[in-house]
């Protein structure tokens, strides 16, 4: 096989690179650091490049039965010398001050342009506040910067209480009270946590509500449903007012009716707990039954209770017979007055009936009666006779009719006034 490897760079006789097959922009050469596309002066030292294209021998080669002839190096040199000179050339040797290896410094420093000729550059509103010498600005502030004060937060271990994870269900009143005493003695280590405070407040409210509930046995576990039932019963009993026919609530929650006037005078305080109130009512019922059997004449028993639930004193009063004022005595004078008014009215009606002559009662006309008895002036028109005619011309008859109606209205007004003033 023929040797297709390129010769070493020492065999190169020219400083320029041969023309490449593809087109590459000059800017891409400048960015990559390949400045060998420029024609270097004769005084420049020899700079071997890794981008040199391989030079092939002048001997013709056969590739798959075809003869390929490569151009000679002398022809390449003559072609490059006859070509026009490029526009750009390197005036100074490139310096390498960048920390990145192989990257030369820029030929034109844009910061120098902004400092020397600031009027040529239009400042944008986004870059107005940025200083020109940004590196110096950062370096000056970096030396005089105050170190930041770091606050090391203390990581507290969560002291989880196992009682908070369990459901809120007290085993007994004694265990609940001991637990609450222990909670009061403990300091609030987790005061910053909001959830622990909320749970503690709920437990405290539950303890205060369950403390006054009647518990049958201390050792036996109680169901919270039973406690809620008893609390509802006690709240209903506290809202009820004690009446002559009141009720007694025992520990089992049943309501037993008590007939009689034995709980009329029972005095109790609303601040007393429900358990003491129920116990006092049970004791009162038993004492009432005993007293009823011993002394059936006792009318009422008065019993006072203190806030502690202890009975202060009890009294037993015997009934005494008293003369009750009857209801009719209050209206005796009213009835006597009304009866006297009615009697007087009857007497006046009888007198008027006696004064009416027989001719008018028989139905004879009024002018005949006037002719027969002209001297009689006391003529009264009968109100009950419909057949008797009324003489409108006679003034005497109209005045008598008005007097009679006025008397009746006056009697009715007096009777009504008496009843109104008495009430």
Swiss-Prot record:
Give compartment(s).
Cytoplasm
Arranged from A to Z, the UniProt key words for this protein are: Cell wall biogenesis/degradation, Cytoplasm
Residue stretches of biased makeup (Basic and acidic residues): 392-405
Q: Which domain of life is it from?
A: Eukaryota
Which biological process terms from the Gene Ontology are attached to this UniProt entry?
fungal-type cell wall organization
Could you name the Gene Ontology cellular component terms for this entry?
cytoplasm
List compositional bias (Pro residues) regions by residue number: 1-10
Summarizing the function annotation, the protein's role is: Involved in cell wall composition and integrity and response to osmotic stress.
Extra remark: Present with 259 molecules/cell in log phase SD medium.
Output this protein's name. Answer: Protein HLR1
The record lists the lineage as: Eukaryota, Fungi, Dikarya, Ascomycota, Saccharomycotina
